[in-house]
């Protein structure tokens, strides 16, 4: 078995290396045949020193790249590593062909080991293939591979320091200009996002709902607007304006999420955390999402009790509850909840029937797990794990496919509001159906999204109808009487009622 794996590793290395040198050489040749190849750099880069010794860490990436093949523990890990490297090569090659750039600065004469390494590099390299820096892309991909394997803290620190030195060396060896570095970092993070080493890869699936394309168009428009502002600002004001292109990239990725990838573009894992690659790429959008939540929630209650022990509210309150069902894709969970389930959904989109079913199932399990007398919550959390449901969230990398076309988003109007007798009756229904309520054990469960008005309310409505026998209007009236600003789409009733029928037939 080990011999077979070793042969697979060796063959993979030979094939990937051949593709690397063939494609890299081809794009260099194409660029050298062009009459005028542009060069982009900042004036301050003239002050960057040439450190001949930094060719050693620069070259070390080649060794680490190759060694990684033989550190893969099985064929699955080897396949993931190979596909990451090939994805990096494809992305870089496409940019080298479409946007050829050069680095024209002459290197000082160097002797000794550094001179030998520079001469070896010059044997196959030309001053082209600049942005995004393939060296930086591979630094991200290969670095993530090694960090994943490191266990000791000191080793992780040493690896981060060494790979940072590799990244710096592209400047101090006069191999690249600065602009090649952030573009390379972005491309490397994108590779890790679409093809992670753990979990399922990002799934491509065309959205079937008009609402998702409308939001995709909005974010794509914001992407173009911020890109225009970045370029224009750099021309008439300062090169610092180019950092707006980071926001442009984040908006473009969110647009792709609405149109193709679903909530998986946020890569929120079962512990309620965004993976590092997604966090880096989407950072500007995530900051804006938090500002937006702050704006809409200012002066308002962050959560409200709907039924005894069962609350609806913002994910910002999640740390104060014993158990949480989190429906927000764009927010990370606060620390605190002992039992946590993640079911990420896109904002401003009506949950699909499948999402509603999974959300209702998760909530029912949380109710039975949390809102009952005599259970030791920490022990229960330990038995279940921090994400007890194998069905929930991005932990298993599943992108939910939306199957029906949604109507325009609007508040669903129903006649009347729940009066006190209806609320009392609702409490009794909950108490009778659950047997032992949270009133007797003091435990609290939160169903949440960004604001606690849309996605989480939809899931709670589905649970009340399917598992607690509420009529849709009664459930909605109860929610609106307890938490203002509830906003659900006009198509939600049909989806929940269809789900209730489907559930009753099982």
Positions of PLM-derived features:
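N-terminal transmembrane-helix/juxtamembrane module of multi-pass inner/ER membrane proteins
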Residues: 1-64, 108-109, 118, 262-274
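Alpha-helical transmembrane segments that form the membrane-embedded catalytic/substrate-binding core
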Residues: 138-139, 176-196
């Amino acid at each position: 078995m080990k011999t077979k794996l070793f042969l697979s590793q060796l063959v993979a290395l030979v094939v990937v290396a051949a593709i690397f040198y063939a494609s890299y050489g081809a794009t260099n040749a194409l660029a050298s045949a062009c009459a005028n190849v542009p060069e982009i750099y900042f004036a301050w880069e003239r002050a960057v020193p040439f450190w001949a010794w930094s060719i050693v860490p620069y070259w070390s990436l080649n060794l680490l790249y190759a060694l990684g093949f033989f550190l893969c523990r099985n064929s699955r890990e080897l396949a993931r590593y190979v596909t990451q490297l090939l994805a990096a090569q494809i992305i870089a090659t496409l940019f080298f062909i479409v946007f050829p750039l050069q680095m024209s600065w002459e290197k000082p004469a160097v002797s000794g080991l550094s001179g030998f390494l520079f001469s070896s590099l010059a044997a196959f390299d030309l001053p082209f293939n600049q942005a995004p820096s393939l060296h930086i892309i591979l630094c991200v991909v290969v670095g993530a591979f090694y960090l994943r394997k490191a266990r000791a803290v000191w080793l992780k620190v040493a690896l981060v320091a060494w790979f940072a030195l590799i990244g710096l060396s592209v400047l101090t060896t006069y191999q690249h200009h600065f602009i090649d570095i952030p573009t390379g970092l972005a491309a490397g993070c994108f590779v890790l996002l679409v093809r992670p080493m753990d979990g399922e890869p990002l799934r491509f699936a065309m959205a079937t709902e008009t609402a998702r394309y409308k939001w995709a168009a909005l974010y794509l428009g914001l992407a173009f607007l911020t890109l225009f502002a970045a370029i224009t600002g750099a021309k008439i004001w300062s090169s610092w304006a180019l950092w707006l292109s980071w926001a442009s990239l984040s908006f473009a990725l969110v647009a792709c999420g609405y149109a193709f990838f679903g909530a998986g573009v946020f890569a929120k894992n079962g512990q309620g955390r965004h993976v590092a690659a997604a966090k880096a790429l989407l950072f500007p959008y995530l900051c804006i999402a938090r500002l937006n939540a702050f704006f809409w929630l200012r002066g308002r209650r962050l959560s409200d009790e709907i039924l005894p022990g069962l609350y609806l509210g913002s994910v910002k309150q999640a740390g104060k509850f014993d158990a949480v069902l989190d429906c927000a894709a764009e927010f990370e969970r606060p620390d605190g909840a002992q039992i946590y389930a993640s079911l990420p959904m896109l904002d401003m989109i009506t949950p699909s029937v499948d999402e509603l079913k999974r959300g209702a199932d998760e909530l029912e399990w949380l109710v039975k797990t949390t809102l009952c007398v005599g259970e030791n919550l920490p022990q229960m959390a330990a038995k279940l794990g921090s994400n007890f449901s194998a069905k929930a969230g991005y932990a298993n990398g599943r992108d939910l496919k939306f199957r029906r076309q949604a109507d325009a988003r609007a508040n669903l109007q129903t006649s009347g509001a729940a009066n006190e007798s209806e609320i009392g009756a609702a409490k009794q229904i909950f108490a009778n159906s659950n047997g032992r309520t949270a009133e007797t054990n003091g435990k609290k469960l939160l169903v949440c999204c960004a604001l606690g008005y849309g996605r989480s309310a939809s899931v709670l409505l589905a649970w009340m109808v399917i598992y607690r026998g509420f009529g849709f209007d009664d459930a909605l009236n109860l929610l609106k009487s307890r938490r203002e600003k509830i906003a659900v789409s006009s198509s939600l009733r049909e989806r929940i009622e269809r789900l209730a029928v489907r559930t009753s037939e099982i």
